[in-house]
């Protein structure tokens, strides 16, 4: 079940709000300019599937997003427990960063926690299969796949160069609870 946990930076270990109903999560995030949607994935895709397989399986949804949102690039995150140690870029996703363009996180299988740092608050969204999160340009965030990752997700970018992080220093991610997975 998807979940939104909101923290104030002065009390990073005590949530101010915890929501688990899709409508409540979407309404809270909409106030920040973030869209939270549900869309059924095309077909099941196993964690650890290659980028080509994921894109081929989800081609219809990708084409729809590209057409309606002006997205120019896509990448795939596909990790399972057996291959997690071979993914050194996971540490880069955990560092707080911003992207120049709007981007979409489409969770196809498994789960991932995305933390969005807005002003004095952290909005931590546990996204699961079929969740779609549209993040505005310039919003500080990080992705946490947990200690035992099992995730297949697509990221669509309005920036033609894809994922080009602008890291935030100091990063806030170490002050807040991590995703246990």
For each predicted feature, which ranges?
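Double-stranded beta-helix
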Residues: 146-181
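A short secondary-structure junction signal
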Residues: 116-126, 145-146, 165-167
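N-terminal leader/capping segments at the start of a protein or of a new domain
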Residues: 1-68
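Conserved short histidine dyad/triad with adjacent acidic residue
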Residues: 75-100
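Polybasic, positively charged surfaces/segments
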Residues: 72
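Short, conserved beta-strand element in jelly-roll/cupin
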Residues: 98-118
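Conserved metal-binding segment of the jelly-roll/cupin
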Residues: 127-147
């Amino acid at each position: 079940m998807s979940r939104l946990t909101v923290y104030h930076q002065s009390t990073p270990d005590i949530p101010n709000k915890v929501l688990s109903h899709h409508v409540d999560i979407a309404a809270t995030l909409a106030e920040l300019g973030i869209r939270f949607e549900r869309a059924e994935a095309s077909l099941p895709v196993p964690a650890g599937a290659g980028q080509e397989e994921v894109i081929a399986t989800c081609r219809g949804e990708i084409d729809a997003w590209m057409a309606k949102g002006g997205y120019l690039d896509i990448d795939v995150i596909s990790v399972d427990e057996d291959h997690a140690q071979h993914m050194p870029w996971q540490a880069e996703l955990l560092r707080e960063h911003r992207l120049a363009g709007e981007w979409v996180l489409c969770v196809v299988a498994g789960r991932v926690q995305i933390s969005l740092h807005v002003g004095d608050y952290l909005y931590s969204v546990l996204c699961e299969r079929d969740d779609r999160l549209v993040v505005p340009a310039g919003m500080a965030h990080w992705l946490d796949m947990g200690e035992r990752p099992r995730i297949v997700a697509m990221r669509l970018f309005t920036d033609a160069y894809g994922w080009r992080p602008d890291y935030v220093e100091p990063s806030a991610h170490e002050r807040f609870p991590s995703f246990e997975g």
